[in-house]
UniProtKB/Swiss-Prot annotation:
HAMAP family per UniProt: HTH_type_WhiA
Organism: Halalkalibacterium halodurans (strain ATCC BAA-125 / DSM 18197 / FERM 7344 / JCM 9153 / C-125) (Bacillus halodurans)
Keywords linked to the UniProt accession: Cell cycle, Cell division, DNA-binding
Species classification: Bacteria, Bacillati, Bacillota, Bacilli, Bacillales
PANTHER family listed in its UniProt record: CELL DIVISION PROTEIN WHIA-RELATED
Protein name: Probable cell division protein WhiA
InterPro entries named among the record's database cross-references: Homing_endonucl, Sporu_reg_WhiA_N_dom, Sporulation_regulator_WhiA, Sporulation_regulator_WhiA_C, WhiA_LAGLIDADG_dom
NCBIfam families linked to this entry: DNA_bind_WhiA (TIGR00647)
GO molecular function: DNA binding
Length: 320
């Protein structure tokens, strides 16, 4: 089961007050519902491929409208994966339900935006967002390369209204048009965890945070290892270059031709090619030399070798 599916399953098990049940139901029906007229009677089908969400819709309708007759049907998809499709159907009193949820007005006028009457309380704003996520939401697993949570809407007006509702909780949500509709999305991991908290997905929130922290720790360790590796490669590369230059000088003019301080370091570097500059300085018999002092002498040796390669006579290139 995907992280999004696990999160939705958790949400379908939450207990809610009547006002919040109404708000959540309004989002689910607005986003997943379809209307039909049969024998001059308005009917409502709410469709989903998620059995837990279908049961949630059925339960919420019976809670908010206990006297209404509701059917829960199962159909088999005939195309592609042939998954089950679940229908929550109202053949009667659909108009009453839709008006009560502020989805339609008089004359069957459909309201595309979220009614303030439905989300007047903070708890109901949270519940509407929960219903919207159940109906059209998705969330990346926190292990993936990028954090992303989105809610899909067919209609631009509802998408704008939904984005405003999310941002009433300072979630920094943004809107985007898609090929077949519109989305409101969040990219920041901290805001995604806030959203999960708002809609009541606390187990999903804890899992998301655990994975995110471990992921950040791994990334920090990897950056540190990469940095250490780069430094090591740089050190090894410098040591190999120094040895190569010292051997070149030995072949061309002999190490005895070097000033005493340079010769000491040159001979030590040839004998101890894998030690650090600090360790090399501690091996000087005439007295310890600092890391910067060793580095200075080796630079002089490098410069001398480069001058000799360029054809500068040894006498004029010898450091004083």
């Amino acid at each position: 089961m995907s992280f999004a599916a696990t999160t939705k399953k958790e949400l379908t098990q939450l207990e809610t007050d009547l006002c919040c049940s109404k708000a959540e139901l309004a989002a689910l029906i607005r986003m997943n519902g379809s209307l039909s007229f049969v024998n001059k009677q308005l009917g409502l089908d709410v469709t989903t491929e998620n059995a837990a969400i279908a049961r949630r819709i059925y339960t919420l309708i019976k809670k908010v409208f206990p006297m209404m007759f509701v059917e829960l049907l199962v159909r088999k998809k005939m195309r592609l994966k042939k998954n089950n499709v679940y229908l929550v159907r109202l053949k009667q009193e659909a108009e009453t339900l839709l008006k009560e949820l502020k989805i339609i007005g008089e004359g069957f006028q459909i309201h595309r935006t979220i009614s303030t009457d439905i989300v007047s309380a903070t708890c109901c704003r949270r519940a509407y967002l929960r219903g919207a996520f159940l109906a059209g939401g998705s969330i990346n697993h926190p292990e993936t390369s990028s954090y992303h949570l989105e809610i899909f809407s067919l209609y631009e007006e509802h998408n704008e209204s939904l984005c405003e509702l999310m941002n009433s909780f300072q979630l920094n949500a943004k809107k985007l048009e898609r090929k077949k509709g519109f989305i409101t999305y969040i990219k920041e991991s901290e805001k995604i965890t806030e959203f999960l908290n708002i809609i009541g997905a606390h187990q999903a929130l804890l899992y998301f945070e655990d994975v995110r922290i471990m992921k950040d720790m791994r990334n920090s360790v990897n950056r540190l290892v990469n940095c250490e590796t780069a430094n090591l490669n740089k050190t090894v590369g410098a040591a190999l270059r120094q040895v190569e230059n010292i051997k070149f000088l030995d072949q061309e003019i002999g190490l005895d031709a070097l000033p005493t301080k340079l010769r000491e370091i040159a001979e030590l570097r040839l004998k101890h090619q894998d030690v650090t500059l600090k360790e090399l300085g501690e091996m000087v018999e005439s007295g310890k030399v600092s890391k910067s002092g060793v580095n200075h002498r080796l630079r002089k040796i490098d410069e001398l070798a480069e001058k000799l390669r360029a054809g500068v006579p040894a006498e004029s290139s010898s450091p004083r």
